[in-house]
UniProtKB/Swiss-Prot annotation:
This is UPF0125 protein XF_2346. InterPro entries: Mopterin_synth/thiamin_S_b, RnfH, RnfH_sf. It comes from Xylella fastidiosa (strain 9a5c). Gene3D superfamilies: RnfH-like. It holds the Pfam family Ub-RnfH. Belongs to the UPF0125 (RnfH) family. PANTHER family: UPF0125 PROTEIN RATB (PTHR37483:SF1).
Length: 80
């Protein structure tokens, strides 16, 4: 289970029963900041909360974007 913020990353390993879903992993992990998640991914691929996990899957909690990526690039280009 992985959740990242601009200034830190939290990663934890949890053991689940065979056939466990993403929502089961999220509930078991009980990470701080989990309520900010707007979606889930497994190894960078978007999945639903009902996605069945396989052994070794890395579940990522996705946060909302703070700024549009195109706008961020424009701002960096102007300040460079």
């Amino acid at each position: 289970m992985l959740i990242a913020w601009p200034d830190r990353v939290h990663c934890c390993e949890i053991m689940l029963q065979e056939g466990a879903r993403v929502v089961d992993a999220v509930e078991m992990a009980a990470l701080n900041g989990i309520e900010q998640a707007v979606g889930y991914a497994v190894f960078g691929v978007l999945v639903t909360s009902d996605h069945v996990l396989n052994e070794g899957d890395r579940v990522e909690l996705l946060r909302p974007l703070l700024i549009d990526p195109k706008e961020a690039r424009r701002r960096r280009a102007v300040s460079a």
